[in-house]
């Protein structure tokens, strides 16, 4: 019962929701879909929701045609995550604009497909987690 949202009264100000946890319908980098987690309908009354927990960056719909943003992780945390699309986000309240900002990872977890030594010698190895 700890995930019971408050009643949000609509006023003249923007209601910005902050949430940490998995949300039903979102995915991890390895393709796992959250089926029975926090329901997006509980964000009713929010003009935008900024979320954290799932390491995969995602944008999803909330009630009243509004958007929510799962920021993802600042850098790749393990081999199961993609190398790209990690960083932070900036929300412009006045323009209702959200931008993802990528950060470089100085020590990435690289995952390659190499069939033989020839792949390395001819440059045919494939980076799988970009």
Predicted regions mapped to residue ranges:
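His/Asp/Glu-rich metal-coordinating catalytic cores
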Residues: 1-68
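Binuclear metal-dependent phosphoesterase catalytic core
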Residues: 68-130
């Amino acid at each position: 019962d700890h995930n019971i949202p408050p009643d949000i009264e609509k006023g003249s100000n923007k209601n910005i929701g902050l949430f940490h946890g998995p949300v039903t319908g979102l995915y991890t980098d390895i393709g796992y879909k959250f089926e029975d987690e926090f329901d997006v309908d509980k964000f009713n009354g929010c003009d935008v929701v900024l979320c954290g927990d799932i390491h995969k960056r995602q944008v999803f719909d909330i009630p009243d045609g509004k958007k929510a943003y799962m920021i993802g992780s600042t850098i790749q945390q393990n081999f199961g995550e993609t190398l790209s699309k990690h960083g932070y986000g900036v929300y412009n309240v006045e323009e209702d604009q959200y931008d993802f900002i990528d950060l470089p990872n100085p020590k990435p977890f690289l995952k390659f497909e190499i069939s033989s030594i020839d792949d390395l010698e001819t440059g045919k190895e494939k980076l799988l987690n970009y």
